[in-house]
Design a protein with these regions (language model features):
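Catalytic phosphate/metal-binding cores of nucleic-acid and nucleotide-processing enzymes, i.e., regions
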Residues: 2, 16, 140-141, 160-162
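Active-site-proximal helix-loop-helix substrate-binding element of RNase H-like nuclease domains
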Residues: 63-87, 153-189
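Substrate-recognition/cap helix-loop segment adjacent to the acidic, metal-dependent catalytic center
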Residues: 109, 126-148
């Protein structure tokens, strides 16, 4: 079971009303969270230093086995280049993957003195919808995330940089982006975390 390797600054709780931002990216077998497979999930925690400067901290990720009866849309698989049957995916069942990730995040949340985690994502509604659907299928009771509040870097990117596309917002923020790595849950989550922290640091503390 992965464990936190850093100490989280409890100062974070004062910046986001008791929420710990967690950047999430999912890769899926389609666009419908009720019927389509969740295939990858990555979570990136954020932390801040003694001066209150935010930075991406730790990453936890899993490949996930499609749930029984899940739809695998060929168009979606062509985009994310995932082969759900590949033997080296080492995929976990949804419940096992989420429970491991949530335990990791809950430890960070406790250290940061936060009440809940809040999902950060690029077009965050999509990631939150798939996450909530997987939680419901798995009947997980201890969900660290707020059920509907989220921070959307597409919206924030439009506000800060006039761009809603992740690659373009990163370019405006002078953060590298490799199109060959795009649609990997880990890569997209880590780049989104860099973008989120850059925007938070630019905005400053209230």
């Amino acid at each position: 079971m992965p464990e936190n390797k850093i100490t989280y600054n409890p100062k974070i709780a004062g910046r986001f009303r008791g929420y710990l931002p967690i950047v999430i990216d999912v890769e899926t077998g389609g666009l419908n969270p009720a019927t389509d497979a969740l295939l990858e999930i990555a979570a990136v925690t954020v932390n801040c230093d003694a001066q209150g400067v935010f930075y991406p901290a730790e990453t936890i990720a899993h490949h996930i086995e499609p749930f029984t009866g899940a739809v695998l849309n060929p168009d979606s698989l062509a985009i994310n280049k995932i082969d759900p049957s590949h033997p080296f995916r080492f995929a976990l069942q949804e419940q096992d993957a989420l429970e491991q990730i949530f335990k990791f995040l809950q430890a960070a949340q406790k250290q940061a003195n936060c009440n809940r985690c809040v999902l950060v994502g690029h077009n965050a509604w999509f990631d939150l919808a798939f996450l909530n659907a997987a939680i419901n299928r798995s009947k997980i009771k201890r969900n660290p995330f707020h059920g509907f509040t989220c921070f959307d870097t597409a919206t924030l990117g439009a506000l800060m940089y006039g761009q809603t596309v992740l690659a373009e917002a990163l370019k405006r923020a002078q953060i590298p982006f490799d199109n060959n790595e795009h649609h990997s849950a880990i890569y997209d989550a880590e780049q989104t975390a860099k973008l989120f922290c850059k925007m938070v640091n630019t905005a400053g503390w209230p």
